[in-house]
Regions:
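Enriched for short, Lys/Arg-rich terminal
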Residues: 2-7, 11, 19-22, 40, ...
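A short, surface-exposed loop/turn module that caps and links secondary-structure elements
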Residues: 29-53
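Phosphate-binding glycine-rich loops and adjacent basic patches that engage nucleotide phosphates
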Residues: 21-26, 47
Length: 85
């Protein structure tokens, strides 16, 4: 599957520490390569179909899997307290 990062999360990735951003991208690429596998620190989100969250330290990455388009789309990236609002 392809990995698509929306405009808002892309801006956040550009502003955070490069080492942290690269680590996040590496994890997201691994998920996009095999979304059906079990990945550490990933949980399905309630109330949103095909939506998951990845925990990366104090950061959360919310993404959706679109099996029809074969895309993993990152919709939100932020600190734990802000990403779920």
């Amino acid at each position: 599957m392809d990995l698509a990062i929306e405009k808002g999360p892309a801006k956040i990735l550009a502003r955070i520490q490069p080492k942290v951003a690269m680590s996040m991208l590496t994890k997201m690429e691994a998920i996009a390569a095999n979304p059906a596998a079990r990945h550490a620190n990933v949980e399905k989100m309630q109330g949103i179909k095909n939506a998951f969250r990845l925990r990366h330290g104090d950061w959360r990455i919310v993404y959706e899997i679109d099996p029809n388009l074969a895309v993993v789309r990152v919709t939100k990236i932020g600190p734990r307290g802000q990403v779920y609002r």
